[in-house]
């Protein structure tokens, strides 16, 4: 193959056109139209943003380690860290890693496509993100609250705290940052939908697609339908702040609760956007290391479709405390609990996939099993919070923080690490150190559980969220939680060392290091795959 490619290159030079030439050096990445290079840039970006977001969370836990103000003597800065940590982890870590990174890398490979449908649009989808991230970081250095820098309104940006409460320009920077991140995701969503519907290899019907591709398809539909609503909401906030409109200002006939409705109509689909690609990755990994096909493939695919659909009609369960009618609350309680059904289908299908399988506990598999266990814990506390009467007491306490961190910090992040170790040999051609990867898992597992399990107790005791200080009664579990965050931080260092170690030792991985269980198309290609794959489309039986 190399010979024919070289001969073709000589021939093309004679004619002054070489379809196979691609830019090298920095141009290869800055001008990239290659889904693998763009996916790699997304993953590197996600790691950088993730380290920054994790550093902020460790600063938050360092502050809360003891009662009294420890390090945030300008107490507004504590809320800036809370806000930035949330926005960074959601928009610049989880989404770029799962959708931009693994999605770009493996959707074309898994459906037998040569690339994405719109390669140049793919490029700007990525490059909008560093600009967006830059704007968010800039917001922390300009005035927000009077006499203090940065946005301290929480990632939810509730008015009036984000309007009259932040007269400085910081919130405007954050709004423009979110606009760019949203534009990036909408363009990416259009690209994925077009690619998955139009570029599948012959024989690759929708019902033969790998579940990871299904998960990305559902996810990008959620993005396409929910992000424009967020864009509308934050544009209205921008005009309320700068151009005299009163969408959310009661003195002009507006309603601050309208902002919450618009925000959460985006925000609830968003949390499913964060977890659905993880579901897809876990399905591939559990199947691979159990050496058998996923149990209930069609049920798994349509469970994700159902989760995506119902996810759009439950948004006000974030708003039980704003004074909705009992009938409205009753509807949102019931609708929210219905989501537990397709989610349960997925949990039990993963367990059924492992049942009777020839299981091999390599690093990706232990991350996946950890995901299933911890995501289930997070799901159970979610069913608790779905009850409006219970939520009245637990709303804005650490019980809510514990709930969503169990599905995100111990759910989505575990899925990302599972996917990282699963596909790292395919992306790089190098094998990681199994011992380091397992050490990374166990240190992280112990750390994150120490951080977030005690927060359920704090919430049940009534400790509210987003406060820099707290009564002495809450000191014990906060100390445990903060120690856990340092352990988790050490886990991140093990991860970074594991990556450096793999690139230093360069142990060749082979085309398929996982054996007979790995049945999707990417394992038929070399590791790493060629710059252009599937120039002759594969045929799927």
Curated annotation (Swiss-Prot):
Crosslink (1'-histidyl-3'-tyrosine (His-Tyr)) position: 268-272
Region annotated Disordered, chain positions: 1-21
Gene3D superfamilies recorded: Cytochrome c oxidase-like, subunit I domain (1.20.210.10)
Coiled coil segments of this chain: none
Membrane topology note: Multi-pass membrane protein
Catalytic activity entry: 4 Fe(II)-[cytochrome c] + O2 + 8 H(+)(in) = 4 Fe(III)-[cytochrome c] + 2 H2O + 4 H(+)(out)
Record-listed heme a3 binding positions: 403
SUPFAM superfamilies per UniProt: Cytochrome c oxidase subunit I-like (SSF81442)
Pathway(s) this gene product operates in, as recorded in its UniProt entry: Energy metabolism; oxidative phosphorylation
EC numbers, comma separated: 7.1.1.9
Superkingdom field: Bacteria
Keyword Iron: yes
Main location: membrane
InterPro entries recorded: Cyt_c_oxase-like_su1_dom, Cyt_c_oxase-like_su1_sf, Cyt_C_Oxase_1, Cyt_c_Oxase_su1_BS, Cyt_c_oxase_su1_dom, Cyt_c_oxidase_su1_bac
Uppermost EC category: translocase
Molecular-function GO term, any one: metal ion binding
GO annotation, cellular component aspect: plasma membrane; respiratory chain complex IV
Family recorded in the similarity comment: Belongs to the heme-copper respiratory oxidase family.
The protein's name in its UniProt record: Cytochrome c oxidase subunit 1
